[in-house]
């Protein structure tokens, strides 16, 4: 007897976090496909069924046009009558204001506002997606969620009973002058390292620039501290995992979050990326850089 296919359709507002969601499903062992045209799905099901090896699929479905939307609705109707496929819909949402903010930050164009106002495109998309949202088994509002928090919500809703998703580490740089990260599990202060801020050529740059990174890391104090911190994390990460945590946030801070913490976070994050799923984020890098450039 052919094993049924567990299908999750990831959809929702553009900019609400579908890319992060797809990565989370990959960590849960799903075969993920981004933006496959609905017209190709029957052939895709046929190939999956014939392979006999794929039992969990997550499809990211974006709204490109009214015609595309009609194809999606037809696809869902066909799935309702398909005994082989057990489907669920995950709808990701966020407030209009938050979506505008995210689009302005990334400078990308909204798919339904290529030649018009961003807000008009958002409102048009929201109206078109009303039926899909109403049909969704899971709706997640990502307005106030970090990528880590969204991942955890997906793990909570979609991991199989008794299964454990891949352990996830978020390494975050930050500036103490902008406050401690409230969701950090581990906070480390690297303000004792040499500060590139006082070197004129390095001041407008960041710890992502090779010359600044090397300035911060290429000294005995930095190397010694890195080795000890790495050893500590190597010892405690398996213990966090054994306790059932799905993720740990390591926050590394310097004064402004532009130079030292960025360089150190990059090195720590990359060091653990072979053993764990790792995200490296720099909370205050743009904020402090703008302040420096104005001074």
From Swiss-Prot:
The keyword GTP-binding applies. Keywords: ATP-binding, GTP-binding, Nucleotide-binding. The keyword Acyltransferase does not apply. GTP binds at residues 62-65. ATP binds at residues 12-19. It comes from the Bacteria. GO terms for molecular function: ATP binding; GTP binding. InterPro entries: P-loop_NTPase, RapZ-like, RapZ-like_N, RapZ_C. Signal peptide: none annotated. Belongs to the RapZ-like family. Displays ATPase and GTPase activities. PANTHER family: RNASE ADAPTER PROTEIN RAPZ. NCBIfam families: PRK05416.1 (NF003828). This is Nucleotide-binding protein LSEI_0959. It comes from Lacticaseibacillus paracasei (strain ATCC 334 / BCRC 17002 / CCUG 31169 / CIP 107868 / KCTC 3260 / NRRL B-441) (Lactobacillus paracasei).
